Amino acid sequence: MTYNYLLILIIIYVIKIICRYFKQKNELQMESKTNLDSSKLVDPINQVNQINQVNQVNQTNQTDKIIVSFRGDKYDITDFLRKHPGGKNILIKNNGKDIEELMAEYEHSKNAYLILSKYKITEK
């Protein structure tokens, strides 16, 4: 009789473990569904356009020029390096890249966007 009792306890324990596993799995699935933010989804067409913009910028870059892309346009900001309040290194580091996310990440005044517009070298 004690053997049967022990066997029943083991079966109950295993069932609890299995139930806990499925409960945790379900909670993780629900959490991932609720955390899904459509604004974070990647738009494949937009991503291809950004890659093309970067490739175009890279093709036009010369070693002594700092050219960046912003909202589809290209800017030669070489002459602005010494004037940039955040230092020239961040501009050099982003040579040949799209800086739209970078501009949004660091707070810029309206004047900063006006200054950038003076360095535009191409239209969309």
From Swiss-Prot:
<comment type="similarity">
    <text>Belongs to the cytochrome b5 family.</text>
</comment>
<keyword id="KW-1133">Transmembrane helix</keyword>
<dbReference type="InterPro" id="IPR036400">
    <property type="entry name" value="Cyt_B5-like_heme/steroid_sf"/>
</dbReference>
<dbReference type="GO" id="GO:0016020">
    <property type="term" value="C:membrane"/>
</dbReference>
<dbReference type="GO" id="GO:0020037">
    <property type="term" value="F:heme binding"/>
</dbReference>
<keyword id="KW-0408">Iron</keyword>
<comment type="function">
    <text>Membrane bound hemoprotein which function as an electron carrier for several membrane bound oxygenases.</text>
</comment>
<feature type="transmembrane region" description="Helical">
    <location>
        <begin position="5"/>
        <end position="22"/>
    </location>
</feature>
<dbReference type="InterPro" id="IPR050668">
    <property type="entry name" value="Cytochrome_b5"/>
</dbReference>
<feature type="binding site" description="axial binding residue">
    <location>
        <position position="108"/>
    </location>
    <ligand>
        <name>heme</name>
    </ligand>
</feature>
<feature type="domain" description="Cytochrome b5 heme-binding">
    <location>
        <begin position="49"/>
        <end position="124"/>
    </location>
</feature>
<keyword id="KW-0812">Transmembrane</keyword>
<keyword id="KW-0472">Membrane</keyword>
<keyword id="KW-0349">Heme</keyword>
<keyword id="KW-0249">Electron transport</keyword>
<keyword id="KW-0813">Transport</keyword>
<dbReference type="InterPro" id="IPR001199">
    <property type="entry name" value="Cyt_B5-like_heme/steroid-bd"/>
</dbReference>
<dbReference type="GO" id="GO:0046872">
    <property type="term" value="F:metal ion binding"/>
</dbReference>
<feature type="binding site" description="axial binding residue">
    <location>
        <position position="84"/>
    </location>
    <ligand>
        <name>heme</name>
    </ligand>
</feature>
<keyword id="KW-0479">Metal-binding</keyword>
<protein>
    <recommendedName>
        <fullName>Cytochrome b5-like protein</fullName>
    </recommendedName>
</protein>
<dbReference type="Pfam" id="PF00173">
    <property type="entry name" value="Cyt-b5"/>
</dbReference>
<dbReference type="InterPro" id="IPR018506">
    <property type="entry name" value="Cyt_B5_heme-BS"/>
</dbReference>
